[in-house]
Amino acid sequence: MAAAAASRGVGAKLGLREIRIHLCQRSPGSQGVRDFIEKRYVELKKANPDLPILIRECSDVQPKLWARYAFGQETNVPLNNFSADQVTRALENVLSGKA
C-alpha cells in the first residue's frame, strides 16, 4: 500500500517534499478521493510523519493529487471518478516515481 511504500523511504529518494490532494466536498467525481481520505489517510500519515500531506477541499474543483519535489518541481495526477483503490495506486505511483 502507499503507506508501506512511503515508509520505506521511496518518496524521500526522489526528493519528495509534499503531497497535496485537492477535492470537492460534494461532487460525485471526488467520492473515491473522499473515501480514500476517510479510510486510509490516518495510516498514510502515521507511516510518513515527516512528510506534509495536505488535504484541500474546494467547491467544484476537479480532484487531483499533487506532488512537490526538491527545487520546486511538481507533478499532478487527475483523480476524477477514481475509486479509493485507484487513488491508492496513483499515490503509490507518485511515491515510486512512476507518475
Curated annotation (Swiss-Prot):
The modification N6-acetyllysine is found at residue 64. The modification N-acetylalanine is found at residue 2. The modification N6-succinyllysine is found at residue 64. It is found in: Mitochondrion inner membrane. Disulfide bonds join 24-58. Its main location: mitochondrion. Complex I is composed of 45 different subunits. Belongs to the complex I NDUFA2 subunit family. This is NADH dehydrogenase [ubiquinone] 1 alpha subcomplex subunit 2.
